């Protein structure tokens, strides 16, 4: 068995692309078992707890809306190659990803980490949901089959 520790942030589009590429690579080695453990990494550890307006964030990070558009056009194109149809225009808030990482840690203990990570990426990058919002995280947890009580305990505490 090959054990993989992957450091990733739930608000990083390159991490989503990387996950898809890793899945393809693993599928080419059907005779090998892989154990993936997704480890937390925050791209923006100083992000306010409630996140910030997406456009303000992009301008502060890349210097201008035009620079951000150029970068995200490239990310969009790379995503399409991997079967991801990023919907960046639907993202209104760049969230603080801390609580999404807490949810992933619980998911690991329950053998659901891959499912939760997929749901986090899809919720944020495809649906524009604020994955820093405890209610969104709770919905994701319940959808992936946590009991409501356990999910509520993790997300709200």
Language model segments and positions:
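Extreme N-terminus of proteins, especially the signal/transit-peptide cleavage junction
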Residues: 1-2, 29
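Structural alpha/beta surface segment adjacent to cysteine/selenocysteine redox centers
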Residues: 20-124
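Conserved redox-active cysteine motifs that mediate thiol-disulfide chemistry
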Residues: 10-20
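Short active-site neighborhood of thiol/selenol oxidoreductases, capturing the structured segment around
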Residues: 2-11
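Conserved small/polar residues in nucleotide/adenosyl-binding loops
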Residues: 147-154
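Acyltransferase
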Residues: 125-132, 137, 142
């Amino acid at each position: 068995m090959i054990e993989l520790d992957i450091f990733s942030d739930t608000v990083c589009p390159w991490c989503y692309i990387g996950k898809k590429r890793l899945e393809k690579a693993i599928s080419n080695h059907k005779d090998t078992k892989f154990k993936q453990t997704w480890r937390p990494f925050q791209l923006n550890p100083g992000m306010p707890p409630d996140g910030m307006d997406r456009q303000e964030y992009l301008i502060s990070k890349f210097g201008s809306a035009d620079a951000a558009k150029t970068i995200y056009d490239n990310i969009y194109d790379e995503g399409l190659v991997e079967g991801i149809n990023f919907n960046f225009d639907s993202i209104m808030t760049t969230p603080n990803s801390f609580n999404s990482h807490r949810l992933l840690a619980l998911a690991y203990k329950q053998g659901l980490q891959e499912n939760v990570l997929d749901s986090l990426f899809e919720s944020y990058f495809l649906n524009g949901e604020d994955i820093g919002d405890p209610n969104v995280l709770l919905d994701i947890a319940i959808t992936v089959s946590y009991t409501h009580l356990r999910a509520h305990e993790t997300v709200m505490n």
